[in-house]
Amino acid sequence: MLKRLTVLMVLVFLASTPSAFAQKAEISATVGWTLSDGVTGGPVLAPDGNIYDAVDLKDSFSWGLMGGYNVTEQVEVGFMWGQQLSKLDLEGTRLRELGDMSINTYHGYVGFNFFDTDATARPYFFFGLGATNFGSVEYTSVRGQNMTTGSETQFSTTWGAGVKIFGGGNVGARAGIQWTPTYIKSDPGGWWCDPYWGCYLVGDPQYANQLTFGGGVIFRF
């Protein structure tokens, strides 16, 4: 009996609609499609006889979770995680699909929500700092051996915008776009000179980019 009463109380709480700003926490689950690219490098003669000068990531399905807390009616802070189920390609004198790669992103973020908290539609944007992990890839070498590449984690930022939609309850929907550039390396970019600091070598940074179009469900507490 006590268990049933507890469940009933939870359901009543979730179905209730307190004042908009009283619902400060949001949890979202999202799915989408991510457009990805890799980076270029110096030509490398591989054991298969081909020359490769770029690694690329395939566009693919992605999903994620995020949790935010509204510190004011417009400002939100939180953490987000995302995963893209991609494949790693080598490009050069031929295109070679190396294997499956999982790309995981981890970012703390600050967001801004437009309009009042009880509005049906609330446009938003956010900016985050964190890291992107490129998972290991299992592949077969030209000699028929099973090999595995190492995983790599690099600093990344993330930027996003979209709209949240609520129908008056605790459950809503969201749709938006998110761009995540991940720093990979810097190539020599030449020399820069000025009359005060002298001359120094500058780099040309390369980023692996992910552009996600997605949507999902929001639970507001």
Regions found by a protein language model. Name each.
Residues 34-63, 152-153:
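Surface-exposed strand-loop-strand hairpins of Gram-negative outer-membrane beta-barrel proteins
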Residues 40, 51, 86, 168-221:
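Predominantly the C-terminal beta-signal and adjacent terminal strand-loop region
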Residues 17-22:
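Sec/Tat signal peptide C-region and signal peptidase I cleavage site
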